[in-house]
Amino acid sequence: MNTVRVTFLLVFVLVVSLGQADKDENRMEMQEKTEQGKSYLDFAENLLLQKLEELEAKLLEEDSEESRNSRQKRRIGEGVPCDENDPRCCPRLVCLKPTLHGIWYKSYYCYKK
């Protein structure tokens, strides 16, 4: 009976000591995986930040191009009604009172000089 108790006690001590070693190893593995995950997340975050900065630069470039060309788009073409006090006709056009077809509308139109 004593040998059985001693055997069980020995097996119990071995299981407990090996089990604790496994817990420590598991804990260390989990810490390594967490650190790797953090480094991966940092890398992904930096990559996403670079892509967003590139996209923002492209959008700002397009906006600046639009503002550069916006003056030409706001000008009025030939045969379009204009305001006599604030003519916005193209540079080669003049805001004049129409001679025939626009008399009925009582409006000014952009004509060639």
From Swiss-Prot:
GO CC, alphabetical: extracellular region
Region described as Disordered: spans on this chain: 61-83
Biological function: Probable ion channel inhibitor.
Protein name as it appears in the record: U11-theraphotoxin-Hhn1h
Disulfide bonds listed in the record: C82-C95, C89-C110
Family label: Belongs to the neurotoxin 14 (magi-1) family. 01 (HNTX-16) subfamily.
Native organism: Cyriopagopus hainanus
Primary localization class, coarse: secreted
Domains as described in the record: The presence of a 'disulfide through disulfide knot' structurally defines this protein as a knottin.
Record's subcellular location: Secreted
UniProt KW keywords: Disulfide bond, Ion channel impairing toxin, Knottin, Secreted, Signal, Toxin
